[in-house]
């Protein structure tokens, strides 16, 4: 019988973080499990790297990003009782001391192109600009003079330049950013702009 994911030692995550070049991931907005909503993420070799499995009936206020073997890497939780969309990201499945917070920009007084601001302890880390609905976003590092650290782009077929649609896209992560953080920000964008 075919297994959803074989038992193997996951070395993909380590090799992703140690890369000196940009990592190109293919993100498929579909869970590997039946009757689940989520994401399946592959590297350029076609190996499973990350996955997110949420049951259809469950609220999407608590999302767990897992590696290929199902170990939790990051927990993404919606902050309750906040103005606007605000998400807290924790290491593993803990609920203490968030690594960072991502908040939708809703200011009408400024002419910002930013969709989301990512901060840690009141220090802005990243700004996300572009259009998630068009799968054209850039994650800019505020600490490095707005240097692009990751990008979401439409994925096209190798032959004929045919686009796959909005459920399959590329996540290009520069070496300065952890791929799991870039994927967490992609999940948050999807939750904020899902309609």
Show the residue positions of the predicted features.
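Extended, low-complexity, charged alpha-helical tracts
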Residues: 77-79
